[in-house]
Amino acid sequence: MTEEEITALVIDNGSGMVKAGFAGDDAPRAVFPSIVGRPRHQAVMVGMGQKDSYVGDEAQSKRGILSLKYPIEHGIVTNWDDMEKIWYHTFYNELRISPEDHPVLLTEAPLNPKANREKMTQIMFETFNVPAMYVAIQAVLSLYASGRTTGIVVDSGDGVTHTVPIYEGYALPHAIMRIDLAGRDLTDYLAKILTERGYSFTTTAEREIVRDIKEKCCYVAQDYDHELEIASSQPAKIDKQYELPDGQIITIGSERFRCPEVLFQPSLIGMEGEGIHNVAYQSIMKCDVDIRKDLYANVVLSGGTTMFPGIADRMQRELASVAPSSVKIKLVAPAERKYSVWIGGSILASLSTFQQMWISKAEYDEFGPSVVHRKCF
């Protein structure tokens, strides 16, 4: 076998996007939406080779005639058949390799149900016959990618947001906090407040348009109430145009910052619980008093939902208002934070010291799916 053939694969299965590639690379080769689409209409043109399901970008491009489903919700796989389709697509169509030849590193949100990772392990070994695999915690990988061993990672993706304090490479499980409030909830909320403007987005395909509006137009206000005043008194300062796929142009105003505000005020969507700044603070307060200072100085943002302009400054301000006044707070927001989980996985899987950590096929055959809890943090 040549060197290229036995490279480990790193697959970061997000609720919204799959990031996949080879260990040792500095960016994922394949990034596509975690979507499986099925036709909503009857096929009339025979011989066009219509499929009964489409995955990823192809589903996205044909979304006008498909019903789109995300098999991963809040970081937990809810539809294993569709998940298998996504993995199959990843191996054979995107990376164009055969999974029997490569160890696979998968990622998972912390505090996920145990059954979720057991089933992941089972499918990898039994359906795809991988020689070895490992399941890593997403936030830990993000910290690796930022080149630190100590810090608190605030990871917010499409399905789940979590804060994980890590000290000298050890995650502190008692202080991990998780909120099921993330990008997809923001998209839903944006769709709802756009309805008040008279723009209705109802189908699964139109939801994707809203997601695009969110990614292109939204930002985090430094002072929410002040921003609302500007929006009502000088709307021209805030209004932005967006062109829909059919050429219509819509104007969005205060929605631009009202949407991401949900991260700091979940009560806007009727969710009980604290904003992400408070969750991070509580996470730090659950740690030993001696290490808090180091955590405050290394708050690492990761995940696609932390890509809003202004989020780091706002987070810094919010943390400063609750933390002791003498403490120094530093936010780290790497430019590639959308992919930092994947990058961390790529680093981890190519370390020589990591090679003994893999769960081998032999171990799986001996112990069954529960081996994953013994070998993976």
From Swiss-Prot:
SMART domains attached to this UniProt entry: ACTIN (SM00268)
Keyword check for Coiled coil, yes or no: no
Provide a GO CC annotation, any one: cytoplasm
Recorded GO MF terms: ATP binding; hydrolase activity
Catalytic activity as recorded in UniProt: ATP + H2O = ADP + phosphate + H(+)
Q: EC annotation?
A: 3.6.4.-
Q: Where in the cell is it found?
A: Cytoplasm, Cytoskeleton
Name the source's superkingdom: Eukaryota
Q: Which UniProt keywords apply?
A: ATP-binding, Cytoplasm, Cytoskeleton, Hydrolase, Nucleotide-binding
- Name a Pfam family for this protein: Actin
What role does this protein play? Actins are highly conserved proteins that are involved in various types of cell motility and are ubiquitously expressed in all eukaryotic cells.
Q: Which family does it belong to?
A: Belongs to the actin family.
Name used for this protein in its record: Actin
